[in-house]
């Protein structure tokens, strides 16, 4: 039986130099957007914006829908520019800024959830400083849950090349519990398998056996899935790691973090008791996004729209 543990906090991460625009210019753009949308609709009734490089963030979106069924939600999958993993932090930071500006300016979201570990590692700190709506990410929740899940103090983290190289997880674990023995492994190729809807094939298993060797050899007892795509590969990953290793995902507790922000007023909660509306967008092929998204989630998606934020 595969055990995927929910996690408990909001991601914090650090990032490198600013890209393209100076920080104050981005801050002004976000401020202008925020001022515009405040007059367009009641703040409480505005949607929560969620974005990822593609399908991975759907794990977070599903958790939000299950936990907060009355909240409106807008999901943006940047499939035209996926995968983010091999790209530089500066480039990913630029993408995150473009998407966030569009979500605030044109969509009018009241909060943003960065449902992508690579984008969180690259841009969370900057977006929290620049945006005039709350911005929540997905790293620190997983860190805390992985620490809670380990009984021997040996924790593995798998993620994209850029996420692992950023040091975001290493810093977060060092801050949370310096005594944890941490083994990190980049898993290039995992995201592409998920984006193709191939999560349980022999080819996926062969790749997993090769990429997971460092954490398997280290005999970790808790493995943090440091990419929101990876829960879709949980069955394959568990076949390699074995039943004694607890897989940790941040989707559920990221949703709990949003709920806490709604309860304490950080994010204005929707008052109406009617079910929230869902809107799904992709920068790539909208029909393919709908097909693969429904296959991965096991639920129907309303008509997926195409939108290019670049």
Sequence positions of predicted segments:
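Non-catalytic structural scaffold of enzyme domains
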Residues: 30-310
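Intrinsic disorder/low-complexity segments enriched in small, polar and charged residues
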Residues: 14-15
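Extreme N-terminal basic, low-complexity initiation segments
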Residues: 2-10
């Amino acid at each position: 039986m595969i055990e995927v543990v929910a996690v408990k906090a909001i991601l914090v991460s650090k990032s490198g130099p600013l890209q393209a625009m100076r920080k104050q210019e981005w801050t002004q753009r976000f401020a202008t957007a925020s001022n515009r949308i405040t007059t367009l609709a009641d703040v409480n009734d505005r949607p929560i914006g969620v974005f990822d490089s593609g399908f991975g963030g759907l794990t977070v979106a599903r958790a939000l829908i299950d936990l907060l069924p009355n909240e409106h939600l807008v999901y943006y999958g940047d499939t035209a520019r996926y995968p983010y993993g091999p790209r530089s932090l500066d480039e990913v930071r630029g993408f995150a800024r473009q998407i966030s500006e569009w979500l605030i300016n044109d969509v009018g979201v009241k909060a943003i959830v960065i449902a992508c570990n690579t984008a969180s590692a690259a841009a969370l700190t900057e977006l929290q400083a620049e945006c005039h709506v709350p911005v929540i990410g997905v790293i620190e929740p997983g860190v805390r849950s992985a620490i809670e899940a380990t009984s021997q103090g040996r924790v593995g983290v798998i993620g994209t090349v850029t996420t692992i190289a950023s040091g975001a997880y290493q810093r977060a674990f060092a801050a949370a519990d310096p005594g944890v023995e941490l083994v990190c492994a980049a898993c290039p190729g995992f995201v592409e398998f998920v984006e193709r809807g191939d999560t349980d094939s022999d080819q996926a298993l062969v790749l997993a056996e090769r990429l997971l060797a460092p954490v398997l050899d280290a005999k970790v007892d808790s493995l943090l899935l440091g990419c929101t795509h990876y829960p879709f590969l949980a069955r394959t990953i568990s076949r390699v790691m074995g039943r004694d290793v607890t897989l940790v995902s941040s989707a559920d507790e990221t949703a709990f973090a949003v709920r806490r922000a709604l309860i304490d007023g950080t994010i204005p909660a929707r008052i109406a008791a009617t079910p929230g509306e869902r809107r799904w967008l992709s920068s790539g092929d909208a029909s393919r996004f709908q097909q693969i998204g429904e296959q991965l989630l096991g639920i129907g998606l309303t008509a997926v729209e195409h939108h290019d934020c670049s």
